[in-house]
């Protein structure tokens, strides 16, 4: 998790051809990109670095799905190395705010802020695939400037660290002391280890 907003562009399809799907209806054919079609099934993808533009899209999709049906689950699929703290926290707050349960799935990796978001899904509905990798650690700071300003930002990032660790303890069931210790450095967990830790509830080897 980082406080800096200087990142390479995430979640960008400029270099990737996004598949399209033709849906045949009595009113004619409609063409959807694959992500829009999955959104109709209440599936949201969170991939790449989490920054403001990515967070805004995910928040908007969750709010839209809530307005469509406040009773049906939202499914958030995660394959992300993490990203900006404030962007991630906007997603976190929305997960807690919307009425539908939010089921989280890790495929590939959930590191840093994305691991925190994986754990923040509805209890009992947090999953990962067998070869997924999860990594937790403390926030990263990259502020530059005058000594007084650096001290101000240091105090702020320590407050953020304490808040996130308290929330992580709440969602995993681990003690705050364990969370503080394990996030002091990069802590990598396999799918089974993440389940034992309380970051996910189940490792899926096949569809439920």
Curated annotation (Swiss-Prot):
Reaction(s) catalysed by this chain's protein: Hydrolysis of proteins to small peptides in the presence of ATP and magnesium. alpha-casein is the usual test substrate. In the absence of ATP, only oligopeptides shorter than five residues are hydrolyzed (such as succinyl-Leu-Tyr-|-NHMec, and Leu-Tyr-Leu-|-Tyr-Trp, in which cleavage of the -Tyr-|-Leu- and -Tyr-|-Trp bonds also occurs)
Keyword check for Hydrolase: yes
Protein's cellular compartments: Cytoplasm
InterPro entries membership: ClpP (IPR001907), ClpP/crotonase-like_dom_sf (IPR029045), ClpP/TepA (IPR023562), ClpP_His_AS (IPR033135)
EC number: 3.4.21.92
A cellular component term, taken from the record's GO annotations: cytoplasm
Keywords: Cytoplasm, Hydrolase, Protease, Serine protease
Active site annotation, chain numbering: 112, 137
Keyword Hydrolase annotated: yes
GO MF term set: ATP-dependent peptidase activity; ATPase binding; serine-type endopeptidase activity
SUPFAM superfamilies the UniProt entry points to: ClpP/crotonase
UniProt record, GO biological process: protein quality control for misfolded or incompletely synthesized proteins
Predominant localisation class: cytoplasm
Entry's family note: Belongs to the peptidase S14 family.
Annotated function: Cleaves peptides in various proteins in a process that requires ATP hydrolysis. Has a chymotrypsin-like activity. Plays a major role in the degradation of misfolded proteins.
PANTHER family associated with the record: ATP-DEPENDENT CLP PROTEASE PROTEOLYTIC SUBUNIT
Quaternary context: Fourteen ClpP subunits assemble into 2 heptameric rings which stack back to back to give a disk-like structure with a central cavity, resembling the structure of eukaryotic proteasomes.
Listed name of the protein: ATP-dependent Clp protease proteolytic subunit
Organism for this UniProt entry: Blochmanniella pennsylvanica (strain BPEN)
